Amino acid sequence: MTTYDPSQKSLGKEKLSRIPVKIEATHTPLRKPDWIRIRLSTDSKVSQLKKLLRENHLVTVCEEASCPNLNECFGHGTATFMIMGDKCTRRCSFCDVGHGRPDPLDPEEPVNLANTVSIMSLRYVVITSVDRDDLRDGGAQHYAQCINAVREKNPGIKVEVLVPDFRGRMEKALDQLAQGLPDVFNHNIETAPRLYKQARPGADYPWSLALLQTFKKRFPGIPTKSGMMLGLGETREEVETVMRDLRQHEVDRLTLGQYLQPTRYHMPVDRYVTPQEFQELGELAKKLGFSNVASGPLVRSSYHADLQAQGERVS
């Protein structure tokens, strides 16, 4: 069993010291508007779930990425599992997940994940991961093993994956993923291409679009999904262009949410998008042909993913 050592990863200032576009530390961040306030929970379910996760040597993106919805989701007994460790090979300046030399894959992780999902009595599970540029298939085989283990232990469950870009190894990764296909395939486009060098160093906008479309062409019966964060400095026109690009690349579902700065060393919040604008963008997305849209300040790609999959409104 692989034990993850959180002391061996860089965070915040240290993590972002080597990205190509330097970010000045924020000294006077924008004041959060009332609609972005997050209620903290003292529910015992939160601590119980954290205990269960640690006992099974599992990591959640909810914790690692400092998700604003953690208390709500944990309080309801749901979580988005982050496989393949807690150290990412990328240094995205919007993300709070740590950077470092990844640990070896844990061969027991698929079974531990399946058992935890069973204990939680989940009917819908989201599996994501760090980027693993050190692996020849980007970790796709491990994804398939986790999906298959979860399904074997939990008959009837629906599995959504939120995958990295598998840059430089798309065909190999999709060949491996074909051995354990998900019910929903999600890869987040994150932001407008103009901001990629600053926000997503190591990623490539056309490549991400191609990954989504290539998966759809190979597995046309599986819904594809992507998401954007707003408030990084993009314009309304750029948001609409990205939405159209996603539709042109056969993406079925869309999430839009507000970017929140994890620390003062990360990309600053350029603006807080109003609930009204989120509603307008959601309506436009539906007109563009997305079958399912979740648009709101606290929406994240896996926030109430089960309800998103059922077509219910999430905002």
Curated annotation (Swiss-Prot):
Binding site for [4Fe-4S] cluster 1: C62, C67, C73, S302
Ranges that cross the membrane: none
UniProt pathway annotation: Protein modification; protein lipoylation via endogenous pathway; protein N(6)-(lipoyl)lysine from octanoyl-[acyl-carrier-protein]: step 2/2
Residues forming coiled coils: none
Domain Radical SAM core: 73-291
UniProt-annotated location(s): Cytoplasm
Free-text comment on the cofactor: Binds 2 [4Fe-4S] clusters per subunit. One cluster is coordinated with 3 cysteines and an exchangeable S-adenosyl-L-methionine.
Cofactor: [4Fe-4S] cluster
HAMAP family registered for this protein in UniProt: Lipoyl_synth
Protein name: Lipoyl synthase
Organism: Coxiella burnetii (strain Dugway 5J108-111)
